[in-house]
């Protein structure tokens, strides 16, 4: 894919940068793999806001994506690459030799007509899924499981990938894009290559309305609120922040570490912030 800078024919188009989608399927998605997706607008069952800045936006169907890739030994042909409004990555529709169709995260470089296979005997080829024990050290991988059979949880967004650094007994060491090195069970599966649509991060939406289409509402600065609404609020005129930047609930907002899962601490070999002091 490539990016294109739009001509400034209006205020909303000026500065807009979008990803060219010429190779994507233009028709409707595959209906049997669609599910209803309800919008909660960031509210819980009591109507209370649990996630701020959410609401509105276009209606979507959820595309059921196969993150397990457990149909072993059966070749699958890539029918088409599609846009998915629920994620930054594109998705590929696979048609297996037995006629079943499934969506997967589209790896970089995959095009319609490619043949993919999953299983321990699959070749080391972009788009194929294997147990980590069968993948050579130094291979770039994505869609990585954290527990065998649970389905991919790591490196699923556009342009994401990880590198297999080492394999020792029951665990392998994988370096993530953040710099974190993590232990993964060698029976977990991963897909060869990196996720496509890597230029997603270069996109510029151009106008506030484009965020509203995505269901993202405006973000109000705490310093312009009242004291009852935010720790930064209040004062006569422009007062600035009278304390270190914090969230509306008083949690430090700049670099404060919030991880609190001692149960899996031993699975992290190197922290992602180890070089940040």
Swiss-Prot record:
Which stretches does UniProt call biased (Basic and acidic residues)? 229-244
Annotated segments matching region Disordered:
37-60, 223-265
* Molecular functions per Gene Ontology: rRNA binding; structural constituent of ribosome; transferase activity
Record's Gene Ontology CC terms? large ribosomal subunit
What Gene3D superfamilies has UniProt attached to this entry? 2.30.30.30, Nucleic acid-binding proteins, Ribosomal protein L2, domain 3
User: Which keywords, in A-to-Z order, does the entry hold?
Assistant: Ribonucleoprotein, Ribosomal protein, RNA-binding, rRNA-binding
Task: Please give the biological process terms from Gene Ontology that the record holds.
Answer: cytoplasmic translation
Q: Where is the composition biased (Basic residues)?
A: 50-60
Composition bias, Polar residues: 39-49
Q: What residue intervals traverse the membrane?
A: none
Role, per record? One of the primary rRNA binding proteins. Required for association of the 30S and 50S subunits to form the 70S ribosome, for tRNA binding and peptide bond formation. It has been suggested to have peptidyltransferase activity; this is somewhat controversial. Makes several contacts with the 16S rRNA in the 70S ribosome.
Assembly mode:
Part of the 50S ribosomal subunit. Forms a bridge to the 30S subunit in the 70S ribosome.
For this chain, the family text in UniProt reads: Belongs to the universal ribosomal protein uL2 family.
What NCBIfam families does the entry give?
Answer: rplB_bact (TIGR01171)
Q: What is this protein called?
A: Large ribosomal subunit protein uL2
